[in-house]
Amino acid sequence: MRAYTSLVGHILGSHPEIDGYYEMHRSYMLADDLDRQLGQYAAHDALKPGSRLLFDKLLHNDYTLNLALPELADATLLLALRPPAATLPSIVALFAQKDRDDLYATPEGATAYYVDRLAALAGFAARHPGRFHYFDADALLADTPRLFAALERWLMLETPLAADYRRFSQTGVAGAG
């Protein structure tokens, strides 16, 4: 949610152990959803030889995650937030670009959206303590080496992350988040 997730996704997706870099707009409620995610990703981008992680972003409350699935038992979840002073104008600007009038294109609508998202994330965190790693999104720009070290540790990467990243088939495509 306006927390540099496109940049994070591209940095992670450029790593040889990680496939995926964009928002796939899906929930993960059944094991079949994970297979569909893999198929959806592979339809646009080749899977890397030796990759072991598949990345997605769940940026909105519309998408749910069933952590009771055995297939997600060892999933690594990352939560990132950006302060409201930067996030709210970004939400307004994003939704003001849409072709239709959008509630989130106003400061009031953006604030309601942000508060709802925070409440959903707080609820998720309360229900799943110890199942996620949190970082301040601004650390990506303000303290990149420390954040990269934490991400490498959390994801158990064998090689370091790099600030340079690839352009992929869905880079810059509207709706790919």
Where are these regions (language model features)?
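Conserved phosphate-donor/acceptor-positioning beta-strand/loop module used by diverse small-molecule
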Residues: 73-93
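PAPS-dependent sulfotransferase catalytic core
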Residues: 1-52
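Short catalytic/ligand-binding loop motif for oxyanion handling, primarily in non-cytosolic enzymes
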Residues: 4-9, 28-30, 63-65, 86-90, ...
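Glycine-rich phosphate-binding loop used to anchor ATP phosphates in small-molecule kinases
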Residues: 47-67
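The conserved 3'-phosphoadenosine-5'-phosphosulfate
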Residues: 126-177
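Soluble or luminal CAZymes and related metallo-dependent hydrolases
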Residues: 36-37, 59-60, 109-117, 143
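Lumenal/extracellular "mature" regions of secretory-pathway glycan-modifying transferases
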Residues: 23-31, 35-36, 97-113
